[in-house]
């Protein structure tokens, strides 16, 4: 068991180091984005919502086709991938990195590796469910996809995408400040109250 844990830790360290090397040119931008997403200042949440809202208003106004939208998005990614490693050191000054910044960059890369591992793990579990319990797999997939299709049909796709993107960008800050845990705790308490009231009525 200990050997397996050590092997997993060593593999995590190797993957993290590899990712750090790949994203070295993005280090300054990632640290800045990390501060924004974790709401280190009070005005960051409204700024996130404002930028996302402006972006989606532009998309709504231009009303591009799917092909044009995908092409522009990929083109933007290519430009960012080329320009960010060149411009970021000049803007932020990578030679001024502190030990704390380096440690935080390491933590971000480690969290990204862990997230990728979780996603791969869920993907593998899905396929193992398909092999072990095919009926449950197909029923679950059909019901889930039908629900998603129904929601997509009822709600405007651009609005739905806007809500999803906004929630995903606000999620790190919500977790950092314990807001999600707070409301989950409130929901659990309310559910427990309802269950207790139901038990009393049954008695």
UniProtKB/Swiss-Prot annotation:
User: Any ranges marked Cytoplasmic in the topology annotation, and which?
Assistant: 1-41, 87-133
Which superkingdom, per the lineage? Eukaryota
Q: What's the main place this protein lives?
A: membrane
Q: Which UniProt keywords apply?
A: Apoptosis, Endoplasmic reticulum, Membrane, Transmembrane, Transmembrane helix
Q: State the GO CC annotations.
A: cytoplasm; cytosol; endoplasmic reticulum; endoplasmic reticulum membrane; endoplasmic reticulum tubular network; membrane; Sec61 translocon complex
Q: Extract one GO BP annotation from the record.
A: cotranslational protein targeting to membrane
Localization terms from the record: Endomembrane system; Endoplasmic reticulum membrane; Endoplasmic reticulum
Lumenal compartment segments: 63-65, 176-203
What topology in the membrane does the UniProt record assign?
Answer: Multi-pass membrane protein
The organs and tissues expressing this protein are described as: Expressed in the cerebral cortex, cerebellum, hippocampus, olfactory bulbs, medulla oblongate and limbic system (at protein level). Ubiquitous. Expressed in all hematopoietic cell lineages, with highest levels in early myeloid progenitor cells.
One MF term in the entry's GO annotations? identical protein binding
Please give the start and end residues of each transmembrane region. Answer: 42-62, 66-86, 134-175
Coiled-coil spans in chain? none
Question: Does the entry annotate any disulfide bonds, and if so which pairs?
Answer: none
Assembly, in brief, is: Homooligomer. Heterodimer with ARL6IP5. Interacts with ARL6. Interacts with TMEM33. Interacts with ATL1.
PANTHER family assigned: ADP-RIBOSYLATION FACTOR-LIKE PROTEIN 6-INTERACTING PROTEIN 1, ADP-RIBOSYLATION-LIKE FACTOR 6-INTERACTING PROTEIN
What family does the Swiss-Prot or TrEMBL record give for this protein? Belongs to the ARL6ip family.
Give the protein's biological function: Positively regulates SLC1A1/EAAC1-mediated glutamate transport by increasing its affinity for glutamate in a PKC activity-dependent manner. Promotes the catalytic efficiency of SLC1A1/EAAC1 probably by reducing its interaction with ARL6IP5, a negative regulator of SLC1A1/EAAC1-mediated glutamate transport. Plays a role in the formation and stabilization of endoplasmic reticulum tubules. Negatively regulates apoptosis, possibly by modulating the activity of caspase-9 (CASP9). Inhibits cleavage of CASP9-dependent substrates and downstream markers of apoptosis but not CASP9 itself.
Domain remark text = The transmembrane domains are required for its ability to shape the endoplasmic reticulum membrane into tubules.
Per its record, how is this protein called by name? ADP-ribosylation factor-like protein 6-interacting protein 1
Organism (species): Mus musculus
Per the UniProt record, the lineage of the source organism begins with: Eukaryota, Metazoa, Chordata, Craniata, Vertebrata
